[in-house]
Amino acid sequence: MIGGDYMDILFKTDDFVFSYRVGGILIHEGKILLQRPKNDNYAIIGGHVAAMETSMETLKREFEEEIHAKIEVDNLFAIGEIYFPWGKRPCHQISLYYNVHLVDDNIPLDGVFHGYDELDNERIDLDFCWVPLEDLKKGT
């Protein structure tokens, strides 16, 4: 990061929301680690990039904040552009997805474990789930 704490690159207007997010694809023994808020869909672990923070720095920070794991960022895997509802407004999100690997093994490497994130000063409880890649291919 180029000095100091900066705000997330997340713009909210009366009409829409724009979000710049980064996600880390962590695969271990044929399973991918995904996060899921209670009663919601799975998502790739990551978060909003802060101004003056590189996307790779963001990924390292997010993994440390959410699951207390140190990672190394490998190659850029994909770029996504998605649209979805953010409350009552539409959101336009640009996402970078990197392959990552663990530097340490202080998290469970199978099953489900718990963590949390914060957004707009609100704590969001999360389940972190190792999901078999075969299940993703089947859409389950």
Identify what each model region corresponds to.
Residues 2-23:
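Acidic, metal-coordinating catalytic segment for phosphate/diphosphate chemistry
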Residues 21-23, 70-73:
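Conserved beta-strand residues within beta-sheet cores
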Residues 28:
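A cytosolic small-molecule/anion-sensing beta-strand core signal
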Residues 37-40:
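C-terminal lobe/hinge of AMP-binding adenylation domains
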Residues 43-46:
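A short gly/proline-enriched turn/hairpin at secondary-structure junctions
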Residues 49-72, 83-139:
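Unchanged
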